[in-house]
């Protein structure tokens, strides 16, 4: 029992049980999609969730992102920044639509922390949509430490 306690104390002292941010990215040569997400987190702590879309030549149409809706169940939030111009949801996906930004890059942040009642992590997926079909997608997993 003392060995287990010592390992937990050591892990905490070396920040192994703190928040770690991961990055998942993909490109098709023209469009790029990058997601930053809480790879390891603990309840009550602020975390990073961010999506970046880049496209040389800018954006002529709204940007539509789909996120598996169950991923957000572990968070308390103040919302998205910028706020979506339109949101819809089906049984699996939360669709976020944003007005086209100036320039070649779009960035959205999700201001959130892990709910105190969250005990298990989640798998996540972000899709950059092209109409009703995904153009690019990234997947990731958040693990919650005790």
Which residue stretches match the model-derived regions?
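Serine/threonine-enriched low-complexity regions used as flexible
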Residues: 118-138
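Solvent-exposed, conformationally flexible loop/turn segments
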Residues: 43-46, 89-91, 101-105
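Hydrophobic beta-strand positions in extracellular immunoglobulin-like domains
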Residues: 52-55, 112, 128
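Short beta-strand edge segments in extracellular beta-sheet folds
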Residues: 141-146
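Short extracytoplasmic
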Residues: 29-67
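Low-complexity, intrinsically disordered segments enriched in Ser/Thr together with acidic residues
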Residues: 102-119
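A eukaryote-biased signal for short, well-structured alpha-helical docking elements
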Residues: 1-28
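Short aromatic-acidic-glycine turn motif
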Residues: 69-82, 133-135
């Amino acid at each position: 029992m003392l060995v287990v306690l010592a390992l937990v104390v050591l892990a905490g002292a070396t920040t192994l049980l703190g928040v770690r941010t991961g990055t998942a990215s993909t490109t098709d040569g023209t469009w790029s999609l990058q997601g930053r997400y809480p790879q390891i987190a603990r309840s009550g702590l602020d975390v990073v969730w961010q999506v970046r879309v880049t496209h040389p030549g800018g954006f002529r149409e709204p940007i539509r992102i789909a996120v598996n809706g169950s991923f957000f169940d572990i968070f308390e939030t103040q919302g998205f920044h910028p706020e979506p111009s339109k949101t819809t949801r089906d049984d699996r996906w939360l669709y976020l639509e944003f007005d086209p930004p100036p320039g070649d890059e779009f960035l959205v942040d999700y201001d959130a922390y892990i709910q105190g009642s969250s005990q298990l992590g989640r798998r996540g997926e972000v899709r950059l949509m092209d109409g009703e079909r995904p153009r690019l997608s990234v997947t990731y997993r958040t693990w919650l430490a005790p």
